[in-house]
């Protein structure tokens, strides 16, 4: 008998069950950065879609997730205000459209069409003056 099994007990080495107690709970990069958006997923998507052959810095994912979270919060806040003005509890694509087109900076940033958003009401100034004279 070589005595290999007894050495661990005598030397006080942790057995398999003790190793689980010593492990720390993993902390996500999102919680480390104080974000709600998933930094790991953003990093993976940046790596797969970049032209740098998968080389993306760790902080690039954090910055990108922070920017996405900020823009989402901004749009949702404005859309929530629009839905509250219309006395509705649910945000619809129409409310998103009104919020984005109502803000000048968001309007220049998001130039795409929002499905189900409708159109923004607009009456030309010359038509308003013509009807006011009569």
Curated annotation (Swiss-Prot):
Keywords: Chromosome, DNA-binding, Nucleosome core, Nucleus. Residues 16-25 have a biased composition (Basic and acidic residues). It is found in: Nucleus; Chromosome. It comes from the Eukaryota. Belongs to the histone H2A family. Residues 1-33 are annotated as: Disordered. One of its GO terms (cellular component) is nucleosome. Variant histones H2A are synthesized throughout the cell cycle and are very different from classical S-phase regulated H2A. May replace conventional H2A in a subset of nucleosomes. Nucleosomes wrap and compact DNA into chromatin, limiting DNA accessibility to the cellular machineries which require DNA as a template. Histones thereby play a central role in transcription regulation, DNA repair, DNA replication and chromosomal stability. DNA accessibility is regulated via a complex set of post-translational modifications of histones, also called histone code, and nucleosome remodeling. One of its GO terms (biological process) is regulation of gene expression. This is Probable histone H2A variant 3. The nucleosome is a histone octamer containing two molecules each of H2A, H2B, H3 and H4 assembled in one H3-H4 heterotetramer and two H2A-H2B heterodimers. The octamer wraps approximately 147 bp of DNA. InterPro entries: Histone-fold, Histone_H2A, Histone_H2A/H2B/H3, Histone_H2A_C, Histone_H2A_CS. The lineage of its organism: Eukaryota, Viridiplantae, Streptophyta, Embryophyta, Tracheophyta. GO terms for molecular function: DNA binding; protein heterodimerization activity; structural constituent of chromatin.
